[in-house]
Amino acid sequence: ELDFEAVMSSQQRLQGIFGSGSPWPKSDMTLEENIASLKVHKQEFALRQAFAYSVFNKTKNKCLGSVYIDPSDSPNYQCVVHLWIRDDSIELDHELFQTVRKWLQEEWRFSNAAFPGRYFEEPKPAKKVKSTVECQLPRKD
């Protein structure tokens, strides 16, 4: 419910965060639809295909936003990251962005992360990697 409240409190600004063709979040999205979406994120996380994180305040009684780490379709980027902060905490947006960039570089060892609509790391020469069906993100336990 905390995630749903955060999404709906910022629904208009979040429209198009995943690209102009994405309908998320719909203005009439229900709690049940939100829960179904969270279940998909949980399954993707378990399968190591993509990683979604909720961002909470210190007391964990308010969801402030989310971070989504997905595989990149481009060989120039190791991952694609979308993140958002709810409208009433928007002053934390830049801090979250900088924290996530640093975390990906230092802990995940991602040197080329794309942040659509925000920032793209300068592409480095792509390394040849074995093509697999699932995302090959470093394991973070």
Enumerate the language-model features and the residues they cover.
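ATP-dependent phospho-/nucleotidyl transfer catalytic cores
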Residues: 96
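Phosphate/ribose-recognition catalytic cores of enzymes acting on nucleotide-derived substrates
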Residues: 93
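GNAT-family acyltransferases
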Residues: 1-88, 99, 103, 107-141
